[in-house]
């Protein structure tokens, strides 16, 4: 609106009198159109955010109705932000790849859960297998890593889990398709990852080494909050030298800390003290998280997964959850910034 005032002043002093009224009239029409488009954009954004909140509430509601905790899939909240709320390309993926990657990763995680391999070997095999699947499908849907590692880190799973992830993935892509049909978001064609297979394999090996070391230390000290799957996804995202997230490490750390606090707030305060059902508690937590995102002007998908996690975590050490999430976030970001930098070309100093 300030721009409109300045243009009106320009019209008053510099536009000839005979053209002035016509100029001002056109200016008012254009400003009204811009304001209307802006309001429409805000309305569409609010609808997309509301859809994520409804997905989270539906997920918890179905889990309670069926008595199957496996239907609470924290990464679905993160995926919903990337696939429904954010209009630009977040991951190199399309709908069928989304379903295949998430379902395949969940099935692999369940198989590893029932295997007799040591914990660290399960994590390493799960991480490397999903990384290979991402390479084969030329995709960058890194939240698939979380689908595989979640039952291993939490040490809880059943054969219902891959079925639940499959159904939730169908729900996600179905809502994305519907939003595109309703013009609430623009359809984006699939664009494969630009890196060569060799480059991606080398990078996956380096990532695997770091993840294995951190997992080994966390397992030794029995502090599994340090290696929650959304944190590993965060590390993989941050390890990309071209990622815009690398420009705001402090903000991302704060968002993860706030998300962890909100998750605990919902589970430990809204439900027992205010008497809210888990469904309403989940909706309230996601609503508050979107307020934080809007205030910070940054949507960060893994933070949504962190906010959902307390719904399925054992609450014996609830006070450690936000502390360890914050420390692990800072650690993973520091490692990514220090050891995963862009290669310098010959013309650079």
Where are these regions (language model features)?
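Extreme N-terminal basic, low-complexity initiation segments
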Residues: 2-3
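Alpha-helical transmembrane segments and their membrane-interface boundaries
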Residues: 6-103, 107, 111, 115, ...
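Transmembrane alpha-helical segments of integral membrane proteins
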Residues: 142-147, 297-309
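A generic, well-ordered mixed alpha/beta core segment in the N-terminal half of proteins
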Residues: 123-138, 147-154
């Amino acid at each position: 609106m300030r721009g409109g005032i300045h243009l009106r002043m320009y019209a008053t002093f510099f536009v000839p009198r005979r053209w002035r009224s016509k100029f001002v009239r056109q200016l008012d029409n254009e400003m009204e159109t811009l304001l209307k488009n802006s309001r429409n954009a805000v309305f569409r954004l609010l609808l997309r955010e509301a859809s994520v909140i409804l997905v989270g509430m539906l997920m918890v509601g179905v889990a309670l109705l069926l008595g199957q905790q496996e239907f609470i899939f924290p990464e679905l909240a993160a995926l919903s932000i990337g696939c429904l709320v954010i209009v630009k390309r977040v991951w190199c993926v399309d709908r069928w790849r989304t379903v295949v990657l998430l379902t395949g990763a969940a099935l692999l995680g369940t198989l590893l859960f029932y295997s007799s391999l040591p914990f660290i070997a399960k994590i390493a095999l799960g991480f490397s297998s999903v990384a290979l699947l991402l390479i084969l499908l030329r995709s960058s849907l890194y939240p698939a890593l979380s689908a595989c590692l979640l039952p291993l880190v939490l040490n809880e799973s059943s054969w219902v889990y891959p079925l639940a992830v499959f159904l939730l993935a169908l729900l996600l892509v179905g809502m994305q398709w519907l939003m595109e049909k309703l013009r609430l978001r623009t359809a984006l064609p699939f664009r494969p990852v630009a890196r060569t297979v060799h480059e991606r394999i080398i990078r996956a090996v380096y990532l695997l080494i770091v993840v294995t070391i951190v997992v080994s230390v966390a397992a030794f000290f029995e502090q599994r909050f340090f290696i929650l799957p959304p944190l590993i996804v965060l590390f993989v995202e941050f390890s990309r030298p071209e990622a815009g997230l690398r420009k705001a490490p402090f903000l991302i750390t704060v968002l993860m800390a706030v998300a962890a606090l909100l998750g605990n707030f919902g589970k430990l305060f809204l439900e027992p003290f205010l008497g809210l059902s888990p469904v309403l508690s989940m909706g309230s937590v996601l609503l508050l998280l979107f307020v934080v995102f809007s205030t910070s002007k940054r949507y960060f998908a893994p933070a949504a997964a962190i906010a959902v996690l307390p719904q399925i975590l054992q609450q014996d050490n609830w006070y450690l959850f936000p502390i360890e999430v914050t420390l692990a976030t800072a650690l993973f970001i520091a490692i990514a910034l220090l050891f995963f930098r862009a290669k310098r070309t010959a013309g650079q100093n």
